[in-house]
């Protein structure tokens, strides 16, 4: 099993949108609903994260991992490849590549798999954040 991380590029836009579709309806923190493709494409092209990689397993794209400029970490692996230890390997490779001393993971409080995953890797619960949008 060969796991690699490669920086995203414009050829990954469709794949990344597919991951968003796969996550739709799953407890996640970044999207309440699927954005239009054009909005997604513009977002990816804007290079919003200092580190954003595609996860490759034996040269097949299976997920992505990113780090924001505020050290917030996000990872998603396609359902077919979850619960195989890949996320643990990816997290270690990514943190070694990035080399930061601190990482934050924003996790929906009902996403028990993610809470367990990050806890297993030494992340500790520090706060619950609440959001209010005013139209």
Region locations from a protein language model:
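Hydrophobic alpha-helical core bundles mediating ligand binding, dimerization, or RNAP-core interactions
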Residues: 16-21, 40, 44
